[in-house]
Amino acid sequence: MQPRLIKKGAEADIYFTTWAGRKAISKIRAPKPYRHVELDRTIRKQRTIREANFMSIAKKAGIESPYVYFVDPKNAEIIMEFIEGRNVKDVITPALCREIGRYSALLHSINIVHGDLTTSNFIIDKKRLVLLDFGLSYYSERTEDVATDLRLIKEVLASAHIRVRGAFERFVEGYVSIAGKKKTDRILENVREIEQRGRYARVT
């Protein structure tokens, strides 16, 4: 079938397509005209390879993510499993908040920071929670980097999902179940420090 554009993003374009007779998603990093041609080609190639690797590593760690069917570094394209289901941002519940916390801790346990940890990047497929979009992910052992993931999801849960009572608390419960209380408390302290810096910057 002819690929159909379903989302045009700042970093990549997303197409609905098929692969070996199965529904699939094609993610293509389009060239950036403001970058030097060779530099742009190198950046898109490296980011494509890195994202595909992160998806595979996350899956091995027990995090549901789309299967990678094909990677074309030259054309900066990843063809992956199409996940049928509903976006978590539309069906959020306390139980899903807890599961998102568990997934986040699993990801951080293998030193991967997601980089865009929002409810928009989770899909619930029947009873399977799937984490999407590793395009901004990176390796880090720094507590402050991990805290940026928690800071973002905390902000999202407090603003977009205010109707879910105790959403971030349920997230933390899930996180503690994997990371343990001591490590989680240390990360949350970093989250508070980031928040304080943000408030100070707005005041000054």
Q: What do the predicted segments below correspond to?
A:
Residues 32-39, 86, 133-135, 150:
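Short glycine/proline- and charge-enriched loop/turn segments
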Residues 2-49:
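ATP-binding glycine-rich loop module of kinase domains
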Residues 19-22, 73-75, 126-127:
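Short strand-connecting beta-turns/loops that link adjacent beta-strands
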Residues 55-63, 87-120, 125, 129, ...:
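Conserved kinase catalytic-core helix
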Residues 30, 34, 44-48, 52, ...:
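Conserved structural core of kinase catalytic domains
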Residues 16-19, 28, 70, 82, ...:
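Conserved hydrophobic "DFG−1" position in protein kinase catalytic cores
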Residues 16, 23-27, 79, 131-133, ...:
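Short hydrophobic-acidic sequence motifs that mark active-site Asp/Glu residues
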Residues 130-204:
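C-lobe/activation-segment region of protein kinase-like
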